[in-house]
From Swiss-Prot:
Belongs to the complex I subunit 1 family. It is found in: Cell membrane. The keyword Cell membrane applies. GO terms for molecular function: Methanosarcina-phenazine hydrogenase activity; NADH dehydrogenase activity; reduced coenzyme F420 dehydrogenase activity. Keywords: Cell membrane, Electron transport, Membrane, Methanogenesis, Methanol utilization, Oxidoreductase, Transmembrane, Transmembrane helix, Transport. GO terms for biological process: aerobic respiration; methanogenesis; methanol metabolic process. GO terms for cellular component: plasma membrane. The keyword Oxidoreductase applies. This is F(420)H(2) dehydrogenase subunit H. The FPO complex is composed of at least 13 different subunits. FpoA, FpoH, FpoJ, FpoK, FpoL, FpoM and FpoN proteins constitute the membrane sector of the complex. It comes from Methanosarcina barkeri (strain Fusaro / DSM 804).
């Protein structure tokens, strides 16, 4: 879908996108703090933990206590650690997040019935770009593990490699399936094209494969073999402490939020709302983005809830699941998507 932009707005677009980008960074960081609180609160309610249940109203002060603890811990570095890799790994992990934010729309506003996506920039291949830069975080994990001079950290990193290689393939195929049916690799076009016909109903198998692969890609339970405490102490992050540990996990939480956005944009209809709301000067500005945020929070709660509902898989089970089950299902969904796309005239 081509967006029609009034001529007098065109010179302002770079400035508007810059401001939107700065706001997005702040919002996503605040969202990551909210995700940390949500996970701690849910886990505390499920397991009757004292901290997040009792510290402040709804456990909100637990975040302050965690921040004080992380900032005041001594910054230790293992003997014979590679300083260059060990000290700079967080740059790759957080850099991956910022690069994803450049092309990820977090909503849209409708002015006089015209749609304006809230994205820093739009690319013809934005969905592939987002998938590509999200994988950069693996370099940060390997830098931590290799630079730590610790065998448990290195084992965790190699487990991460095995998992990422196996699940990036079905993840990429399901993304291509959505793009093939829509006729575009632009994630804004994919979201806009869904209307009332969400891709979760048109491609339920693809949505399932994408969500499972995304869980594995993010390293969430039951796919957290790279940091399984019972086997590897803390895996790749064993030697990280203080704010290094905090920034590493903060990047993972931001990845979880951005992954939830991808599910909502690709399969849950994005920000699409009924036409009369889009044409309303008030609701058209607020409702579409709010509608998308509600879907993102729902996906986020499902991801967090699964952590406390499923056991961790063994690494051989993880590899079998990706190559022997999800990959054939992803290929089957691709055939279905291409056929459906031809039938619908995409």
């Amino acid at each position: 879908m081509t967006v029609v932009i009034p001529e007098y707005i065109t010179p302002l677009i770079p400035w508007v996108r810059g401001i939107v980008g700065l706001v997005l960074i702040g919002v996503i960081f605040m969202g990551a703090m909210g995700a940390v609180w949500l996970e701690r609160k849910l886990s505390a309610d499920i397991q009757t933990r004292m901290g997040p249940c009792r510290v402040g109203k709804y456990g909100l002060l637990q975040l302050v206590a965690d921040a004080i603890k992380l900032f005041t811990k001594e910054d230790l570095k293992p003997l014979n650690a590679d300083s260059l890799l060990f000290n700079n790994a967080n740059i790759f992990m957080l850099g991956s997040v910022f690069l994803m934010l450049v092309a990820l729309p977090v909503g849209a506003v409708f002015i006089n019935g015209v749609e304006y996506p809230l994205a820093v920039t739009q690319m013809d291949i934005s969905v592939l770009y987002i998938e590509a830069v999200s994988a950069l975080s693996i370099f940060g994990i390997f830098m931590v593990a290799y630079g730590s001079n610790n065998k448990y950290s290195l084992l965790g990193a190699f487990r991460n490699f095995a998992r990422m290689v196996g699940y990036e393939v079905p993840l990429g195929i399901t993304v291509i399936s959505v793009a093939a049916m829509t006729g575009s690799l632009n994630i804004v076009d994919i979201s806009t094209a869904q209307g009332l016909h969400w891709n979760i109903f048109l491609q339920p198998l693809g949505c399932f494969v994408f969500f499972v692969s995304l869980m594995a890609d993010m390293g969430r339970l039951p796919f957290d073999q790279n940091e399984s405490e019972e086997e590897l102490i803390a895996g790749w992050i064993t030697e990280y402490c203080g704010m290094r540990f905090g920034l590493g996990f903060f990047a993972e939480y931001i990845h979880m939020i951005l992954g939830s956005f991808l599910v909502a944009l690709l399969f849950l209809g994005g920000w699409n709302v009924p036409g009369f709301i889009a044409n309303n000067s008030f609701f058209g500005i607020i409702v579409p983005t709010g509608f998308l945020i509600v879907k993102v929070v729902f996906v986020l709660m499902v991801i967090i809830g699964l952590r406390w509902a499923v056991p961790r898989f063994r690494i051989d089970q993880v590899v079998d699941l990706s190559w022997k089950k999800l990959l054939p299902l992803a290929l089957l969904n691709l055939v279905w998507a291409v056929g459906l796309g031809l039938y619908l005239g995409a």
